[in-house]
Structure formats: structure tokens, C-alpha cells
Amino acid sequence: MVAQIESAAAVRRADEIARVEGVDALFVGPADLQLDLRMRPDLENCSYAECLKVVAGSAARAGKAAGILLRDVAEIAQHREMGFNMLAVDSDLGILRKAYLAVTGAAPAP
């Protein structure tokens, strides 16, 4: 089972979540986490990068995978350095959009 970490509250409880029996990985939902961090400035709010390090560290201490959805392959090395070992790049819609733009951009003008 993969536990989604998408809020400041989930980041604060990442150690606890990672220790739950049956949880194999912590997976950051970056858009939701960033939105939550902006909406809740009064919480014991870490920066986005600090939150990512907390989640990756919690997963590592529990012997679990740490995952995240990235927008671009250029972000892979940076997130591996933070401790993420389950990396997804882009989304199905994003990949289809890029393919569509590549095809239509290569088509000759009428």
C-alpha cells in the first residue's frame, strides 16, 4: 500500500504513517502539498523542500520507499539526492499533451 502525503499535517505525521503495517511507501502529491503549505501558513510550516526531506527521511527510517510525482526528468537527480527512490515523471495527460503538441507542431501549415 502507498500512503499519499499531501498536507502539512501528513508531513508532520510521516514517521507515524511510515510505521503503519502494510504501508510500503510514502508518496508525495506535490501539487496538493504545495497548495496546503500556501493555505496554512500558521501551521508549523516547513518549506516545500524541507517537507520533502522530512518525508524521504521518514520513509528511509522505516525501510520504506519514498516516492514523488515530478514534472520533468530534469528534477530526477535533485530528488534522488533528497532520498526519493520511487520517481514518476509527468502524468498521463501531460504526456499525451506533449505528444499532441509534437505531432501538430511538426505538421506542415495548410
Q: For each of these PLM feature ranges, what is it?
A:
Residues M1-P110:
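Expand to "…catalyze enediolate/carbanion chemistry for C-C bond making/breaking, isomerization
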